[in-house]
Amino acid sequence: MSSLIALGKRQTLLSHNEFLNFKNQKGFCKRFISQLNKKSNFPALAMTVPEATKYLKSVSISVPYVGSYMLSIALKSNRRAPSARGQIAFPHPFQEPPKICVFAKGAAADEALKLGATYVGAEDLVKKIQTEPLEFSKCFAHPNSAELLPQVAKLLGSKRLMPSIKRGTISDELKPLIESALTAVDYRQNDAGSINLPVGKLGFSDKELQENIEALVSNVRFTLAKLPGKVKVTVKHVHLSASHAIAIPLQYK
C-alpha cells in the first residue's frame, strides 16, 4: 500500500509505512518535505515555469509591465572554488540599454559616439566626472586616453567601473566592447553562493520567460565549466520570484 502525494502537476510516491512514520513524528511537515526532496531530482514543491508564473502573477502587486521576474541560481561549491561571473544576451531583451562612458580621442571617440556611447571624451570627460554627477554603468578606454585614468581612479574604482587591460576594458577595438555592453547583461556570484538576475517582465508570455530562463541557466553552466581549479561547481537549485512575491523552486533540465 502506498500514499500518492500530488504537488501541482507532479506526483511523488511514498510507501504507506514511510508516510505513517513521518506523520507520527514531531516536525512532520519539514521532515516529509525533506523526504520528498530525496526521492526527486527537484525540491518537493518545484514547479514548471507556467505553473510558477500563474502563482507569482496572482500575488504580485506591481503593474504587469513594470514588475519583473527574478531568477536565483544556487550554486553547489565550497570556499575554495573561484567566484563565477559572466555575461548573457537574453533572447528576449527587456531592460533599458545601459549608459556607457568611453575615454577616447579623435577617430576612436567619433566611433564610440556612433556606436551609442553616452559619454565620450578625454580631458574634458575627466573634468565632468570630477565635477558632475554623471551616471553610467559601463566604462571603457582607448589606449590613446588611458593615461588620464589615474585622475579618476578613486571615483571609478569605488563603483567598480575603472577600465583595465586585465579585464579587457582598455582596448583599441572599442566596437565589440560597446556592442556587447548594449546587448549583454553582467552577472556574478554573491557571497551567499547564488547568482541573482532579472529574467523578464511580468507581461512576458510563458514561452518568452522560459526561453530567457533556459538561456541564463545554460550560460551559467557554461561559465561554471570554465572555472579554473580542481573544485567542481554545479547548479544546485533554481528559484523564480516576482516583484513583492515569494520565490518558487523550478524544475529545470
Swiss-Prot record:
Subunit structure: Component of the mitochondrial large ribosomal subunit (mt-LSU). Mature yeast 74S mitochondrial ribosomes consist of a small (37S) and a large (54S) subunit. The 37S small subunit contains a 15S ribosomal RNA (15S mt-rRNA) and at least 32 different proteins. The 54S large subunit contains a 21S rRNA (21S mt-rRNA) and at least 45 different proteins.
Species this protein is from: Schizosaccharomyces pombe (strain 972 / ATCC 24843) (Fission yeast)
Protein's cellular compartments: Mitochondrion
Protein name (record): Large ribosomal subunit protein uL1m
Similarity annotation: Belongs to the universal ribosomal protein uL1 family.
Transit peptide: 1-81
Keyword flag DNA repair: no
A GO CC term assigned to this protein in UniProt: mitochondrial large ribosomal subunit
Role, per record: Component of the mitochondrial ribosome (mitoribosome), a dedicated translation machinery responsible for the synthesis of mitochondrial genome-encoded proteins, including at least some of the essential transmembrane subunits of the mitochondrial respiratory chain. The mitoribosomes are attached to the mitochondrial inner membrane and translation products are cotranslationally integrated into the membrane.
Keyword entries, A-Z: Mitochondrion, Ribonucleoprotein, Ribosomal protein, Transit peptide
Keyword 4Fe-4S among record annotations: no
Stored Pfam families: Ribosomal_L1
Any single GO BP term: mitochondrial translation
GO molecular function: RNA binding; structural constituent of ribosome
